[in-house]
Amino acid sequence: MGQMNWHTLLSDRRLEREVSSLPSFRSRVRNEFERDYDRMVFSAPFRRLQNKAQIFPLPGTIFVHNRLTHSLEVSCVGRSLGNIVTSGLRERYEALPFYDSDIANIVSAACLAHDMGNPPFGHSGERAISAFFREGAGAEWEDAVRSEGGRWEDFIRFEGNANAFRLLTHRFEGRRPGGFALTYSTLASIVKYPYSSLSAGGKNKFGYFATEEETFAEIAQHLGILRLQDSPEVYARYPLVFLVEAADDICYQIMDLEDAYKLRIISYEEVSHLFMSFLDIEEQDTSREVLRSIEDRNERVAYLRSRVINHLTEACGKAFLEYEPEIMTGEFRSPLVAVIPEAEACKAASRYAYKHIYTAQDVVDVELAGHRVFSEIIERMMHALMHPDNAYSRTFLNRVSSQYNVHEKTTYGKIQCTLDYISGMTDLYALDLYRKITGMNLPFA
């Protein structure tokens, strides 16, 4: 069996590499992976994450996490994981030049980008899009897509991770080649599922659409990512994906519990018990000692949350180093949170969240709204794309940003154009557009 090599895995080559006139400035002030991080922070799609719901509806009187705050926190945890792993690898491979910040910067940048392809209304937005094409009005276009050679599975299993890879690599109308022109290492770190929708099976998870398949293959070849299967192609995970995934798992699971407490969905006793279950006996005793000096319950929860995140971060960093040989051969495929000593506590917290948090009325209402809003917008835009000469169609398409190619010829291309447009919306923009095109909110009212 083959093995991946850190020499080739850490590469600052960029997609559609730009010609630089300031190499000395860039090498002196920022390395290439720091440029990736900064490029995303200053981008419009990243800013729009501030008005995309994580789990709970926005805005509210109690400030809970949105996609932006979540991504920033994941990036912080990812950086810490990168530092832990760098320290361990430097000891293990003394001859290799593991630069102090490269892995941490790559993981941190990838963490920033991991949710940039998600549509409005949280994960319910992904489910709403998939349901529309699988069992809703969108099913009527399946025969047309397949007869044209398109990949229908890309839509009935719509995946925000694949959409993030498209957003970062696709050349939208009027934009530069290579999308964000990020480094190959940062882009590879985003692809949690290194295969297309043809290999997704019943998991409904995949890493790239048919339109970006060649782009990922190019990146994989340059970095030396192992190919595990041909036709359809399945690759081993790029090693740093495990760190990005762990950072996301740690943050969303722990922060969802804290948000649920702030919204009074769960009690102080429940959240503190769940947080304590992640800690060993010694840490529990230390935590209780500190908690005696804290009167404010919100501050108590915040303190426990910080201890748990720190504890899980260290555990996942150690797990990566333990399983690194199997990761490098593509044999290890489990999330890091599933192989740490705290795995059972993670499972218990996840079960609790699904039973008591993700079924809360506010969360369910967001999902119901998402289904209705997406169905209406997709239907109207697809009608406009299919019949562009109609008066209503011309009016509707005039609202669409010029970066989206409304002149796509194939049905697959028209659907993808529609989903590019919708997934770039914020929650408020999607809701406002829905109200306007249905006449619920008239501009002169």
Where are these regions (language model features)?
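Sequence-structural signature of the catalytic-core scaffold of metal-dependent phosphohydrolases
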Residues: 1-29, 41-52, 61, 72, ...
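Charged, amphipathic alpha-helical oligomerization/scaffolding segments
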Residues: 73, 242, 246-249, 308, ...
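Acidic, low-complexity proline/glycine-rich segments
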Residues: 35-47, 338-345
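Substrate-recognition/cap regions that form aromatic- and gly/pro-loop-enriched pockets
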Residues: 321-402
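Glycine- and acidic
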Residues: 57-66, 110-113, 149-150, 232-233, ...
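Structural signal for terminal/edge beta-strands and the immediately following C-terminal loop/tail
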Residues: 2-18, 425-445
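C-terminal amphipathic alpha-helical interaction region
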Residues: 394-442
